[in-house]
UniProtKB/Swiss-Prot annotation:
Family label: Belongs to the IPP transferase family.
Organism ancestry: Bacteria, Pseudomonadati, Pseudomonadota, Gammaproteobacteria, Alteromonadales
Listed Gene3D superfamilies: 1.10.20.140, P-loop containing nucleotide triphosphate hydrolases
Identification of the protein by name: tRNA dimethylallyltransferase
Purpose of the protein: Catalyzes the transfer of a dimethylallyl group onto the adenine at position 37 in tRNAs that read codons beginning with uridine, leading to the formation of N6-(dimethylallyl)adenosine (i(6)A).
Transferase as UniProt keyword: yes
């Protein structure tokens, strides 16, 4: 685990190529095909050296829930173990980790028709009005979910409209926790400034690699828009808005790196309260040895 740009992928590939491990990606951006540069997806050469499960499994027009991830990850874990290898789960989507380790409440599957109804309502009335609707239906969820978080707000309303029960009611029970022993590590720089520098450096590299052109190709499709989970991934939204001439290139870079720093902050907030977690410092020699020694 770890915040974005902390060096998780490089360490995981080192581990997978030197030990009897196979990687399962725990990343809500890497699941999408044709989103390679902005998601910092491992290169074709890296994937050949160390294949990753749960990468490139969806089109950007599709949605994917934590429940979907848990189902697919459990199947991947069983497959890897059956071949005598050790599953190595790597990523920064903390909700996916939480769902896998602790189990999930029995929430209804996504309903695209209802989701589109909610989106249309948001476009006419605004997300603030929908947030007030949620507060009236489910005050606990309304307090927890910010009006500027359309993905979670939409899901809470969708659950209620499908089932007639609130998210709070349905989350009182959970499925069984992960039936395996898990050793958990997090990697991050000790200094926040170093992480911010890594984020800025990586985004500049993405631009050099053709990130704007990647987003332009996605934007040229007639089935993608900014309300989709794929297009809400950090960097993609800001670059899309730049291509729409909402702001200039320098502002796009500033907004994208700021959004990435906010993502890293949220990830670190999760990790600081995560139980049974062992920490590694980014860029330190010997991390792989430490990882293997403490995993035994």
């Amino acid at each position: 685990m770890g915040p974005t740009a902390s060096g998780k992928t490089a360490l995981a590939i080192d581990m997978a190529t030197q030990y009897n491990c196979e990687i399962i990606s725990v990343d809500s951006a890497l699941i999408y095909r044709d989103m390679n540069i902005g998601s910092a997806k491992p290169s074709a050469e890296e994937l050949e050296m160390a294949p990753h499960k749960l990468i490139d499994i969806l089109d950007p027009s599709e949605s994917y829930s934590a429940a979907d991830f848990r189902r697919d990850a459990l199947l991947a874990i069983e497959d890897i173990i059956s071949r005598g290898k050790t599953p190595l789960l790597v990523g920064g989507t903390m909700m996916y980790f939480k769902a896998l380790l602790e189990g999930l409440s029995p929430l209804p599957s996504a309903d695209e028709a209802i989701r589109q109804q909610i989106l249309a309502q948001a476009q006419t009335e605004g997300w603030e009005a929908l947030h007030q609707e949620l507060c009236n239906i489910d005050p606990v969820a309304g307090e927890r979910i910010h009006p500027n978080d359309p993905q979670r707000l939409s899901r809470a309303l969708e659950v209620y409209r499908i089932s007639g029960k609130t998210m709070t009611e349905l989350t009182q029970t959970k499925s069984a926790a992960l039936p395996y022993d898990v050793v958990q590590f997090a990697i991050a720089p000790n200094d926040r400034k170093v992480l911010h520098e890594l984020i800025a450096k990586r985004f500049n590299i993405m631009l050099e690699q053709g990130f704007i052109e990647e987003v332009a190709r996605l934007k040229a499709r007639d089935d993608l828009h900014l309300e989709l989970p794929s297009m809400r991934c950090v960097g993609y939204r800001q670059c899309w808005q730049y291509l729409d001439n909402e702001f200039d290139h320098a502002t796009m870079v500033e907004k994208a790196t700021a959004a990435t720093r906010q993502l890293a902050k949220r990830q670190l907030t999760w990790l600081r309260s995560w139980p049974d977690l062992q920490w590694l410092e980014s860029g330190v020699e010997g991390n792989l040895v430490t990882l293997m020694r403490q995993s035994r």
